Regions:
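Extracellular/virion structural assembly segments
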Residues: 2-11, 69-73, 81-112
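Short, cysteine-centered beta-strand-loop-beta hairpins and adjacent loop/turn segments enriched
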Residues: 62-65, 83-88, 156-162
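Catalytic micro-motifs at enzyme active sites that drive phosphoryl/nucleotidyl and oxygen chemistry
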Residues: 62-68, 131-141, 162
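Oligomerization/assembly interface segments of phage tail-like spikes and tubes
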Residues: 70-85, 142-157
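Intrinsically disordered, low-complexity regulatory tails
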Residues: 148, 158-168
Length: 169
């Protein structure tokens, strides 16, 4: 039972970042990065933008069996980062609290969108009931604080063998 789910999680997360009023009022730029290593490339734009919501365009994946069918688990990661005045721990705490608030608003929007079927059944397999998040340590990036969160999406996949896909010896 493979789903014909054409839902684009990356575009969805970018839209959430671009339409959140708190993120807009604090000039967060929505963009993509390729894994944690890609963050440094985006950081080069800190001269133009002080705050970012970065959607990791790579996923961790796992295919597993759950009884009679198989599922593809995709793990999506989103970084919410804000710059602060270097060595100003009060400013750092304020910016970290801002990132926390944006994350909570995004989480509540995920729950709302899934429960209201706003996107049809596209969000059906998105696990909004358990989202892992981790805050950046104090000195992980000079002058930058924030957090990232990870969201699982488990979709059925059809792994039925099809002999027509194989050349016989």
């Amino acid at each position: 039972m493979e789903t014909n789910n054409t839902f684009n999680a990356y575009d969805y997360f970018k839209k959430l970042a671009e339409t959140n009023k708190l993120a807009q009022s604090n000039n967060f730029k929505a963009c993509f990065c390729s894994g944690p290593e890609g963050i440094n490339d985006v950081m080069q734009e800190f001269r133009k933008y002080a705050n970012f919501i970065m959607i990791d365009d790579t996923t961790s994946q796992n295919t597993y069996s759950k009884g009679v069918t198989f599922f593809d688990k995709n793990v999506y990661t989103v970084f919410i980062l804000a710059s602060y005045t270097f060595d100003d721990m009060r400013d750092r705490e304020e910016k970290l609290n801002l990132c926390r608030r944006i994350f909570r608003q995004i989480h509540s929007r995920l729950i709302y969108d899934k429960n209201s079927m706003l996107y049809g059944d596209s969000l059906e397999y998105l696990d909004v009931s358990s989202i892992y998040s981790k805050e950046l340590p104090r000195y992980s990036m000079n002058g930058v604080t924030g957090l990232y969160f990870m969201l699982n999406n488990d979709e059925p996949v059809d792994l039925t063998f099809n002999a027509d896909e194989w050349q016989e010896d």
